[in-house]
Amino acid sequence: MKKAAKIVLLAVLLALVGGIVYAVMVWPVNPTRMKPAESYEQLRDTVEKKTDIRVPGEDLLPWTVTERQLRMDGPSRLAKVSGFALSGTMEHGGVAFSAEVSVGVTGVVGDLPSPWDVYHYVPVYLFQNQGFYMTQLYIDGSEYIIQLHYPENVTLPEEDAAYIENTLQAACHDIIDLYS
């Protein structure tokens, strides 16, 4: 075989191997962009080491945490951590709630209502509907969201609704205090 043919064959083989390695590295391994964390400690250490995001304690809400996930900035093996989500359940007044605390890097999109609360100069927004409460706050370029869902056919008594709002407000204050 001539020397030129060997060089061309070697170049083709290297390109083929490079293409395969690239495909393996960018093939979606986390199509939902979420990756399970083995423990709270692993989640906190990973997020705080690789981002500027602070992770609140698991006792942020009166709940049982059932799932801990790292939010990734893409679906591939090369994706980097960009936030987290803690999910769980809580109960109050005989009503079961599913709860989630999540954070990711984002920018404010669209018009926001007037703040529900302002704590240490950070506005906190409350959205509520039948079966749903959500708070949202932006601090140091990160968007924190706390969501509580309950059955839509349940009407919360005033004192239970006040308890939920006070619990959400205290949780938001705890998150903001992490940055103080």
Q: What spans do the regions from the language model cover?
A:
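N-terminal Sec-pathway targeting helices
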Residues: 1-17
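Compositionally biased, low-complexity segments enriched in small residues
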Residues: 2-3, 46-47, 160-162
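Membrane-interface motif at the C-terminal end of an N-terminal transmembrane signal
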Residues: 18-33
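Intrinsically disordered, low-complexity repeat and linker tracts
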Residues: 32-40, 178-179
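Short, solvent-exposed recognition patches
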Residues: 36-137
